[in-house]
Every structure is written in structure tokens, then in C-alpha cells.
Amino acid sequence: MHRMTLLLSTAILVAGCQPATDSASTADGPDPTPWDWSEETVRSAVNQVRAGRDLNPDEWPGGARVAVLLSFDVDNETVQGLRDGVVSVGPLSQGQYGSRVALPRVVKLLDAEGVPASFFFPAWSLKLAPEQAEVINASGMHEIAVHGWIHERNSELDAPTEERLLVQAIESIEEITGRRPVGYRAPSWNFSPNTLDIVRRLGLLYESSLMADDRPYELVADGVPTGMVELPVEWILDDAPLFNPRGDSYASPRDVMQVWIDEFDKAWEEGTMFLLTMHPHISGHRSRIVALEGLIEHMKAKGGVWFGTHEEAALYVREQAGMNE
């Protein structure tokens, strides 16, 4: 019975943090014969949203060689069942651990190290525990951004519903924090055909859900530059798939730390950007936070590092690229 509960909890968590695989090309679902598509159809599908110009600056603030952007998707109860309408007390208690124990532990470490981070909230995660905003904002160096309404599968929604939920989320976060979020990270890191238009229409500064590069870049929609900064993510640089594989075994925090250190060292060598995504309810456990502690220690020892929020990075690369003119 205990094993079954563990498997259920792990499956819910991993499913919530895995990439959505929907690829609907018709109103009735995925086209079963894409090999028969015309060249125009293939190019149109691929070019909906594409990576445009590289926005990696010649150097980062203070002459730093590499930018380090730490982010936390504060999903809590939303991925522990709420977004699917599943009410199961055990998984929901794991979500509460995120706000009750893990987030304060993470912020305490960051504040002690003087390292800023960006916290992406599904609005309901913040509404259920608004005291999280006070914990994050106490130092004045962190950012709170938006990660949907209830970690909904935005790529499966019609345009009016997707926009309504994002507007609700932005307004709710602003009401709780006193500041309108300027950054967006799509739930499950996926776009609908309408997501980019909605994000642009709502005046957000940057987006951080896509994976076309290791460096910041400008998003292009149907071949047209949009002026939207993309700060790309990557599943290798996400704690969820590394700490929570499909099954009932867990990765060693020190093994995970080594993956991140190797990624950072290569980013440092290339002079680009290291963007890491974590979740308080995953990495905020006592045995796992050692991975973040060790990573920060390694990065500081390496030198030539600029630690910034996603907002600060987006503003900087826009300025360096002349996008504010």
C-alpha cells in the first residue's frame, strides 16, 4: 500500500512537470499522416514561433563572463492534483510542504549567499499561501513572476480561456505582492498557437519556456521579429526529471549537482548563460538542498559570474541589443 501511494504521488508530480506532448494540427487532434504534408504546411507549423537573433551580450554586467539565472517554479498544490481536478490529501500535503517548509529554506540559503532568484508562481500557489511573497521580498533582491493560473495545460486551451486565466493570474499576483509581474513561464513549458500573442498583448517583458538555444534570444513569430526576449530553459537543467524519474527510485543529490556543475562550467567556457529551474517542493528537502549549496559554492569559486534575476537579465540584453530604441 505504501509503495502504491509513493508511485501515485511520484507519477502526479512528474506528470505535472513533464513537457506536454500534444501536437494537434487539426481540430480533431494530431494528423495521422504528417508525411503527406506539403512543404508549406511543414514550414508553417515549424515557423509559428522560432528563435530569432542571438541576444547574448559581449559581456555581462560588471564585465562578468557568464550570467547565472536561478529560477524556482513554485507549483506546490497545483501540480499535486489541483490542475487536473484531483483531490487527494497525500499529494496535496506534498504541495503544502513547498510553501510551509521548502520555500523558506530555499530563500534562507539564497539570502545568506547574496544570490538573487526569480520565483514563478501559478497564481493559486500564491493565493493559498500569500505569506510566501513576504519571505521572497524581504531581501529586496528576488523577483516574482507568473506561471499560469492553476498550472493549467495552456496549450490545450482556446484563446479566450487562455488569456482570461493569464489575466487573472497577473492581477492576483499583483494584488498580493503589490507589483505587476513582468515575466512569464508557461505551465509545462509549452505554447498554444495563441500564447505568444497573448503574452505580447499583455505587455510582459520576457518569456522563459522554450528551448531553442542556451543563450537568450528574440522570439520570431511566422518569420517576423517580435521584440520579445526568450530566456530559454532545458529539461537537463530542471530538478523535476532528475530527482523524480518515472518509478520509485530517486537520484542522488550529488549526482544531480554534478550535472549542473558540468553545464555551468561549459556555459562559463562559452561565455553565455546558465539558467537553472528548480521547484521548492522538490529541491527544498534537507538532503537535496545540498545540491544547490554545492553548486553556488562552485560558481562563486570559479569567478567571473553575474548573478541576476530573469527580469534584470532581460532588461540588460534588450539594452545591449538596442531593442529599447
Label every model-predicted segment.
Residues 1-6:
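Bacterial N-terminal signal peptides that target proteins for export
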Residues 14-16:
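C-terminal motif of bacterial Sec signal peptides marking the signal peptidase cleavage site
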Residues 18-25:
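Bacterial lipoprotein signal-peptidase II cleavage site
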Residues 30-61, 171-175, 179-270:
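Active-site-adjacent pocket scaffolds in enzyme catalytic domains
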Residues 33-141, 150, 258, 265, ...:
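Active-site beta->alpha N-cap acidic-glycine motif
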Residues 71, 145, 307-310:
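Generic enzyme active-site microenvironment
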Residues 104-107, 111-192, 226-228, 232-247, ...:
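Metal-dependent polysaccharide deacetylase catalytic core of the NodB/CE4 family, i.e.
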Residues 206, 218, 254-325:
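C-terminal domain-boundary segment and adjacent tail
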